[in-house]
Amino acid sequence: GLLDFLKAAGKGLVTNL
């Protein structure tokens, strides 16, 4: 779902930072 996508994107951003 959309929430899952946002969670995955958030994890990606945190990892990149």
From Swiss-Prot:
Expressed by the skin dorsal glands. GO terms for biological process: defense response to bacterium; killing of cells of another organism. Its main location: secreted. Keywords: Amidation, Amphibian defense peptide, Antibiotic, Antimicrobial, Cytolysis, Hemolysis, Secreted. The keyword Ribonucleoprotein does not apply. The modification Leucine amide is found at residue 17. The keyword NAD does not apply. Disulfide bonds: none annotated. It is found in: Secreted. GO terms for cellular component: extracellular region. Has hemolytic and antibacterial activities. Belongs to the frog skin active peptide (FSAP) family. Ocellatin subfamily. This is Ocellatin-5. It comes from Leptodactylus ocellatus.
